Amino acid sequence: MIASVRGEVIDIALDHAVIEAAGVGYKVMATPSTLATLRRGTESRLVTAMIVREDSMTLYGFADADARDLFGTLLGVSGVGPKIALATLAVYDAPTLRQALADGDVTALTRVPGIGKRGAERMVLELRDKIGPVTTGAGVTAVGGHAVRGPVVEALVGLGFAAKQAEEACDKVLAADPDATTSSALRAALSMLGKK
């Protein structure tokens, strides 16, 4: 198992980064917020989880071990694969997700692309006792009052847009479509910024 990758960031895309370590470029799938912490040409370290399937070997990268461990816990839920687990961590950071699971907040979990009401109920049922310590908080909140705003803004900044420009584009997209998912909001914001 590859537990972490450290090296020069060669490329950053919407859903992955390529990190060169010892002459080998590792494609690491990651959330927009994790990708936003990386810069091309700089040395970075990501904690990783390696998922081996019959037809693929995929690395998933995280900013810290806590997020990686929660990713592994999410994979234990029937019907939740690596893509949905990563999408969940793209919408909610680890403490917020733990709080949603502890509170049984099915509505918050259904905001994650790919998770319906039944899937959210299954997650709460299977993970409520496995999620680890929950920090005290006021329930599930998101940056700017919207669950997808933070990850979308961070992804846009990671792609080279100015923070103010990214925030304005994201706010316009979310004002037009308050129920937008992270991926659809990011696509719409990129389209909007591309027209300027």
UniProtKB/Swiss-Prot annotation:
Region (Domain II): 64-142
Annotated segments matching region Flexible linker: 143-151
Region (Domain I): 1-63
Region entry Domain III, spans: 151-196
A single Gene Ontology CC term: Holliday junction resolvase complex
GO molecular function terms attached to this record: ATP binding; four-way junction DNA binding; four-way junction helicase activity
Cell compartment(s), UniProt: Cytoplasm
Keywords: Cytoplasm, DNA damage, DNA recombination, DNA repair, DNA-binding
GO biological process, one term: DNA repair
Quaternary data: Homotetramer. Forms an RuvA(8)-RuvB(12)-Holliday junction (HJ) complex. HJ DNA is sandwiched between 2 RuvA tetramers; dsDNA enters through RuvA and exits via RuvB. An RuvB hexamer assembles on each DNA strand where it exits the tetramer. Each RuvB hexamer is contacted by two RuvA subunits (via domain III) on 2 adjacent RuvB subunits; this complex drives branch migration. In the full resolvosome a probable DNA-RuvA(4)-RuvB(12)-RuvC(2) complex forms which resolves the HJ.
Family: Belongs to the RuvA family.
Functional summary from the UniProt entry: The RuvA-RuvB-RuvC complex processes Holliday junction (HJ) DNA during genetic recombination and DNA repair, while the RuvA-RuvB complex plays an important role in the rescue of blocked DNA replication forks via replication fork reversal (RFR). RuvA specifically binds to HJ cruciform DNA, conferring on it an open structure. The RuvB hexamer acts as an ATP-dependent pump, pulling dsDNA into and through the RuvAB complex. HJ branch migration allows RuvC to scan DNA until it finds its consensus sequence, where it cleaves and resolves the cruciform DNA.
Free-text note regarding domains: Has three domains with a flexible linker between the domains II and III and assumes an 'L' shape. Domain III is highly mobile and contacts RuvB.
Protein name: Holliday junction branch migration complex subunit RuvA
Organism in which the protein naturally occurs: Mycobacterium sp. (strain KMS)
Species classification: Bacteria, Bacillati, Actinomycetota, Actinomycetes, Mycobacteriales
